[in-house]
């Protein structure tokens, strides 16, 4: 029988056989693969050694990121002195081992396995989404028979609904169990398994429900056949019609690497792009499926100007002239300080740089990107930008981790994956959080409390650190520690952080957006300093690290240079309304102050929206809308939590009248005669940006810390938490993500004891502000508090986190 094409091409690529060389390293062994001598680490599997030298061994169940299962047997090879072929994925190398992957014995075994795998596989290739990129197709071409000898009835498996993201055709399943192992080992949710045995084995969920992990889309990539496919992409295009464009995810501060697959400029799907330093070979669901919002009906596609309360389409020169005239009038009559610039967290570094130039060029220092932040009292003590203390990949090697106001599963899913890897290696994980989040790892100790109690827990932790290390707390923090009550849990956390090195403290978005964030941050930094732990401040929005560096804060300009007269921060710009606002890449849902934003902006004489989406609320408030491109539609630079700078090119085409934000600002700045807006193209702007990103001129000072007096009002303490799929305008418009079981629903989450205290049960309605919300009984909520999802249209009218609220039963 002729040698398969796959095997033949591999054989041709090998070098001339050589004799084995002596062992040099004690932890290595000498082996031979198809006459090719090499040294490999002890404990390596044959398939790993073969991959190292480019020898292709067919496989279905093996994946280098998953535990070995040896289910499919497709990788059978001949090992000299072994009585039968051995699975290359599960056979460890041994000194002097000689392996043959192309011998007649090996090829016969592989062909036989291939025949068995195809016995029950349907001939769906013409209608299967996997066609053209299917591992089974590829291997069958090399090792399959042209005619099947099987004449019995094929089995048929009923499909299961795994939710809005993953389509199932389980008759195609070959039982490789990649999806099962991914859920068990990587996602940590164990939602999929094999039921039955032999030919009756079926892969499915244990209790027949949708998958709830935030990493579920990865099983689409792992599936070697068409059993699990992308439901959003289903039947939309063939792989050979698509062009792969390198890009990044922009919904958290990790900036996972990905490819956007486009057809004629339209995004069809997203798949992971390997980068071991950031996302390995995985992708979160929100980075994978959010692209469907690029063509949402809410997209702003033409410049529009409001005249006499009526919206009309305008051309770009007319819209720019409108903005120029109104800004000139307001700044001339009322002063430049009457301009407030509020920008979202998904803008590019170029956008932040030019917004900083534009605002300060007009004479206003009122610019901020921290729309969800409530406490700005330690601004002058901050470093250049929030970032990790060490490479992201090092987190998985930590021996102790403290999560402070951090839910890495939802804040940054692939950061949560790193924490899980550390836990699996024996790391002890601790938490001080506003809720008992459903982690995919176990906590050694936890302090769960509502917003007021979290401050007490942080102070107790800092005091325990001071006592354990015999170190005096900083002058600004010391007075607050006097009355702190140190618990055994706090002492245990400190002892573990000191004893288990390296250790890390992950300071998350729930801490950064706390009404006493400065105190929490000071406590975390002090604990890190005395225990030797790394202090990792995770940026709470996608490109916050770039926004800080490019001066999108009121007290610093580019490179962290302090300004002589700091402007108003985001909260002050709302509490002290301005006459003119520029809203760039931001919606009302992005603010912590909710209804106060509506009231403040409604009073303005001119509201300029530079954004990608419009809705009735924005149309009511705005006077001019300048449609801007989304990150996949334009070039831009992004800085992730580790400080890695990545510049991407446009992957998809924007509508004809949509412009990149930096282009809009360039024309607007030039029209207004401001300095720094005359450059010919993106290359010139990027060169300036590169120089600016290299600067670190921040001079952190000291700050005064205080804790608000504890409220003794009757009621429950509110904690507003932004949902995993509500963090930005794009995610809020991704229909598939909003249909998942982990997407937040408008509800009040109450501890059972508190629900009993106010006389409500699950499903009952309560009034919160102007909203009427259903009650959900949730034991993860601390007693004395309640949780509400922020970022939703129905929860805009919320008091701020930490407010004491009396819920009214309907």
Pin down the residues of each PLM region.
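Short alpha-helices
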Residues: 434-435, 441-474, 517, 526, ...
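Phosphate/pyrophosphate-binding active-site segments
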Residues: 444, 455-512
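A cross-kingdom feature strongest in bacterial/archaeal respiratory oxidoreductases
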Residues: 2, 57, 62, 338, ...
């Amino acid at each position: 029988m002729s040698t398969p094409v796959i095997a033949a091409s591999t054989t041709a690529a090998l070098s001339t056989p050589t004799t084995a060389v002596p062992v040099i390293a004690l932890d290595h062994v000498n082996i031979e693969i198809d006459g090719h001598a090499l040294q490999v680490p002890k404990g390596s599997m044959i398939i790993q050694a073969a991959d190292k030298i480019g020898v292709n061994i067919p496989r279905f169940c093996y994946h280098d990121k998953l535990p070995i299962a040896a289910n499919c047997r497709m990788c059978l090879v001949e090992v000299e002195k072994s009585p039968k072929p051995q699975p290359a994925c599960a056979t460890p190398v041994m000194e002097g081992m000689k392996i043959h992957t192309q011998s007649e014995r090996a090829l016969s075994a592989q062909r036989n396995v291939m025949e068995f795998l195809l016995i029950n596989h349907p001939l769906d290739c013409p209608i299967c989404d996997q066609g053209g990129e299917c591992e089974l197709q590829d291997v069958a071409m090399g090792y399959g028979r042209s005619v099947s000898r099987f004449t019995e009835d094929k089995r048929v498996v009923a499909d299961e609904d795994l939710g809005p993201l993953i389509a199932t055709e389980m008759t195609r399943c070959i039982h490789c169990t990649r999806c099962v192992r991914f859920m068990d080992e990587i996602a940590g949710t164990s939602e999929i398994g094999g039921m039955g045995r032999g030919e009756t084995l079926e892969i499915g969920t244990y209790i027949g429900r949708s998958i709830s992990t935030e990493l579920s889309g990865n099983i689409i990539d792992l599936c070697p056949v068409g059993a699990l496919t992308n439901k959003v992409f289903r039947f939309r295009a063939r792989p050979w019609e698509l062009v792969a464009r390198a890009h990044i995810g922009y919904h958290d501060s990790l900036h996972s690497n990905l490819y956007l697959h486009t057809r004629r400029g339209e995004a069809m799907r997203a798949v992971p792009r390997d980068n071991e330093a950031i996302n390995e070979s995985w992708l979160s669901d929100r980075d994978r499926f959010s692209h469907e919002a690029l063509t949402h009906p809410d997209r702003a596609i033409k410049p529009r100007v409001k005249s006499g309360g009526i919206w009309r389409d305008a051309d770009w020169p007319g819209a720019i002239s409108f903005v120029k005239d109104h800004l000139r009038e307001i700044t001339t009559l009322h002063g430049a300080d009457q301009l407030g610039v509020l920008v979202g967290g998904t803008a590019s570094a170029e956008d932040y740089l030019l917004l900083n130039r534009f605002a300060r060029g007009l004479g206003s220092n009122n610019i901020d990107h921290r729309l969800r932040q409530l406490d700005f009292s330690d601004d002058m003590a901050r470093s250049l930008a929030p970032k990790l203390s060490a490479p992201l990949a090092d987190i998985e090697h930590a021996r102790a981790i403290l999560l402070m106001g951090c839910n890495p599963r939802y804040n940054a899913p692939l950061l949560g994956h790193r924490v899980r890897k550390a836990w699996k290696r024996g790391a002890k994980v601790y938490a001080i959080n506003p809720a008992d989040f459903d982690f995919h790892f176990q906590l050694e100790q936890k302090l769960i409390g509502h917003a007021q109690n979290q401050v007490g827990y942080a102070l107790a932790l800092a005091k325990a650190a001071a006592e354990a290390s015999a170190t005096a707390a900083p002058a600004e923090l010391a007075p607050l520690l006097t009355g702190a009550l140190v618990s055994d849990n706090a002492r245990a956390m400190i002892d573990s952080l000191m004893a288990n090195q390296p250790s890390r403290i992950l300071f998350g978005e729930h801490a950064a957006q706390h009404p006493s964030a400065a105190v929490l941050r000071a406590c975390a930094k002090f604990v890190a300093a005395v225990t030797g732990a790394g202090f990792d401040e995770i940026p709470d929005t996608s490109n916050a690290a770039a926004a800080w560096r490019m001066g999108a804060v009121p007290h610093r300009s580019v490179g962290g240079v302090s300004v002589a007269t700091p402007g108003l921060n985001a909260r002050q710009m709302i509490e002290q309304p301005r006459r003119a606002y520029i809203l760039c890449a931001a919606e009302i849902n992005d603010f912590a102050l909710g209804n106060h934003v509506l009231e403040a902006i409604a009073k303005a004489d001119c509201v300029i929206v530079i954004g990608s989406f419009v809705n009735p609320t924005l149309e009511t408030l705005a006077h001019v809308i300048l449609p801007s491109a989304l990150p996949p539609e334009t070039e831009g630079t992004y800085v992730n939590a580790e400080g890695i700078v990545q510049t991407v090119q446009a992957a998809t085409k924007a509508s004809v009248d949509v412009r990149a934000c930096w282009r809009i600002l360039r024309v607007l700045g030039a029209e207004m005669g401001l300095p720094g807006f005359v450059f010919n193209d993106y290359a010139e702007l990027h060169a300036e940006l590169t120089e600016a990103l290299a600067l670190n001129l921040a001079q952190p000072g000291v700050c005064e810390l205080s804790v608000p007096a504890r409220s003794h009002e009757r009621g429950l303490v509110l904690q507003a938490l932004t949902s995993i799929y509500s963090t930005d305008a794009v995610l809020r418009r991704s229909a598939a993500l909003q249909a998942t079981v982990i997407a937040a629903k408008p509800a009040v989450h109450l501890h059972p004891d508190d629900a009993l205290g106010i006389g409500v049960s699950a499903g009952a309605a309560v009034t919160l502000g102007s909203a009427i919300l259903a009650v959900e009984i949730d034991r993860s909520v601390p007693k004395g508090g309640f949780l509400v999802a922020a970022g939703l249209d129905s929860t805009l009218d919320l008091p701020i986190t930490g407010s004491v609220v009396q819920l009214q039963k309907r």
